[in-house]
Amino acid sequence: MDAIKCSSSFLHHTKLNTLFSNHTFPKISAPNFKPLFRPISISAKDRRSNEAENIAVVEKPLKSDRFFISDGLPSPFGPTVRDDGVNFSVYSTNSVSATICLISLSDLRQNKVTEEIQLDPSRNRTGHVWHVFLRGDFKDMLYGYRFDGKFSPEEGHYYDSSNILLDPYAKAIISRDEFGVLGPDDNCWPQMACMVPTREEEFDWEGDMHLKLPQKDLVIYEMHVRGFTRHESSKIEFPGTYQGVAEKLDHLKELGINCIELMPCHEFNELEYYSYNTILGDHRVNFWGYSTIGFFSPMIRYASASSNNFAGRAINEFKILVKEAHKRGIEVIMDVVLNHTAEGNEKGPIFSFRGVDNSVYYMLAPKGEFYNYSGCGNTFNCNHPVVRQFILDCLRYWVTEMHVDGFRFDLGSIMSRSSSLWDAANVYGADVEGDLLTTGTPISCPPVIDMISNDPILRGVKLIAEAWDAGGLYQVGMFPHWGIWSEWNGKFRDVVRQFIKGTDGFSGAFAECLCGSPNLYQGGRKPWHSINFICAHDGFTLADLVTYNNKNNLANGEENNDGENHNYSWNCGEEGDFASISVKRLRKRQMRNFFVSLMVSQGVPMIYMGDEYGHTKGGNNNTYCHDNYMNYFRWDKKEEAHSDFFRFCRILIKFRDECESLGLNDFPTAKRLQWHGLAPEIPNWSETSRFVAFSLVDSVKKEIYVAFNTSHLATLVSLPNRPGYRWEPFVDTSKPSPYDCITPDLPERETAMKQYRHFLDANVYPMLSYSSIILLLSPIKDP
């Protein structure tokens, strides 16, 4: 995730905070509710003084008319169904009192609290954990917490008992019913509450198990749940939902995908920075979802329909999506944003972590300011003992309860930064001896990554790091890996983009990329530690990469100041979609060249949603705020392109799957790989070389020959001599469809092959400018 996509989010937090801070739940005053508590005063000591200071009022609990109440247990955290009731447990170090608020779904809509139960510190607190056990009717019941304690931002505390806070461990969070639609009070931050779990019928997994596909064999497809089926051309009953994705999985199966990487599906507020867009005449929203509210809760508004139990519906439909994907041999990886939350900076809304224990969950500077390594206002304190346990519990939950197969960690380098050392010795100016580790300092053996890597449950899942952050930490090739972490290889993207467009000086670096980047992944790591990609949600789509030299982000409402400026793109001679026929032909050729480079490289290829048919966002390389055509998969366009680029992509993915040599478990050696230039076995690695070719021994195909000519000049290539065999064309990106891929079932295949024969009889091949080829060995038949 690029920091720029969040840049506007905390510009609006000041405005939203006013709305949110006034949006509290009034206490019930109706005559049929009798007072629940009898107040008594207590006092607590200030951390910097021995004098007692009366800072809170704790109410002595009485019996509830609705629920049987007992002490409860401090573990596990969150709500847990047991003994015909629910145990609630929440960690809060610095609070002095806690109240659990129970809210019926109907009362939530009316801004009411149904019942409040004050917890007794002598019975309902163990260490720093508040807990209580309740038995009663929890049908359609929600909950939240009030905490009291110091409100002292300069000390890192934001306690305010007027706020009802979300449980960090909540399994489902309820707010608005419909995606992107304001409630009757026009509040962008509506009241939220956590679903109380009940002992319902167990989900039928039908024996579903994790697929555990070898990572070297993966072809990953990065996608957005809502964007995948929201467009009307999807022609499904519930567009923009988990169910919609499940219905369209056969498209991915047809393409050859065996792993989907879901952009954030944790609960987030899509109206976080809701504002009118004067350019498009619609509203800016948080479409991508990189601003989490609840890490255990699936995004509720991705459910197929709202109902009294649409939280449960969302959980079940996410499970159905995973189950249906597994039936088709497709793994599911979640993009998790464990680097910051939606609570923004010091002026942001307070709805969970900040009110529960701000100084624990966030990296704070000595005077309470938020460190902003995420670029989104705050930074999750990942290596604090409590927070890293939270992260571990969260990941375990999604693996064991939701059956996901792995995680991609957004801005994963933040997990390698040191945690806040929040105590008087280093924060409040007390004299200390020696140097202290500055909060956020990169550390070589981060405890949270160590825990994840060696956890017995998580050890077998896919772990992918976006190995950089917005604070300048760039760890591609150097992320703490324990031998199991893969990385989004941003260097692969940049090198391949520059070589394919014909930039001098990249032939050697391009060759490294083709081999799986062994220059980066050393120390026992494998090619599959590199997640190779040309395009992702950040940046240009593949079609825009060959159409625009410059970003076109005016529609984002930030005067084109957001988004990446260094895209290494090339418009092929004319800027924008309206171009000459010759330019459009070259663009299609370049798209094919990029896809060939992705499919013949060692490592794990990743494709961005829509690139398989040439989706365009009109040159916008930062579409985080658009719930419209820019981010919607166009099923009608996919059908139009079915015999063109989609066919090309499908055939190349199938070819990669068939070739044993294109998904190696180890980096290729000279026994298998041979480099060539315009003449066999004479590669040219000079600064001006724009030609790279190699042959690869393959146990299935015997041998394959791949060449890239990124020069503006055509050339004649001499091929390696293989006695008894002839090279035959399989892919030539300079040819129009369907002759760009000569498959056995291609009509007029023999006619097409004859066009090459006189060249191949001479063991040469004519390559046009900006083209790539794949040749296969075929035995010469006796006349």
From Swiss-Prot:
Active site: 410, 466
EC number: 3.2.1.68
GO molecular function: isoamylase activity
GO biological process, one term: starch biosynthetic process
Site (Transition state stabilizer): 538
Deletion consequences: Strong reduction of the starch level in leaves, but 50-fold increase of water-soluble polysaccharides. No alteration of the amylase-to-amylopectin ratio. Absence of starch granules in the hypocotyl endodermis associated with reduced hypocotyl negative gravitropism but normal phototropism, and presence of some starch granules in the root columella, leading to axillary branches with wider branch angles.
Superkingdom of this protein's organism: Eukaryota
Cellular localisation: Plastid, Chloroplast
UniProt keyword annotations, A-Z: Carbohydrate metabolism, Chloroplast, Glycosidase, Hydrolase, Plastid, Starch biosynthesis, Transit peptide
Coiled-coil stretches: none
Top-tier EC class: hydrolase
A GO term from the CC aspect: chloroplast
UniProt cross-references to InterPro entries, sorted A to Z: GlgX_Isoamylase_N_E_set, Glyco_hydro_13_cat_dom, Glyco_hydro_13_N, Glyco_hydro_b, Glycoside_hydrolase_SF, Ig-like_fold, Ig_E-set, ISOA1-3-like_C
Transit peptide feature, positions: 1-43
Catalytic activity: Hydrolysis of (1->6)-alpha-D-glucosidic branch linkages in glycogen, amylopectin and their beta-limit dextrins
Functional pathway: Glycan biosynthesis; starch biosynthesis
Location (main, coarse): plastid
Similarity remark: Belongs to the glycosyl hydrolase 13 family.
Further remarks about this protein from its record: In the absence of ISA2, ISA1 may be unstable.
Quaternary context: Associates with ISA2 to form the heteromultimeric complex Iso1 required for amylopectin synthesis.
Function text: Involved in the trimming of pre-amylopectin chains. Accelerates the crystallization of nascent amylopectin molecules during starch synthesis. ISA1 and ISA2 work exclusively together as a multimeric holoenzyme. ISA1-ISA2 removes preferentially branches that are very close to other branches. Promotes negative gravitropic responses in shoots by facilitating starch granules (statoliths) formation in hypocotyls.
Name assigned to this protein: Isoamylase 1, chloroplastic
Originating gene: ISA1
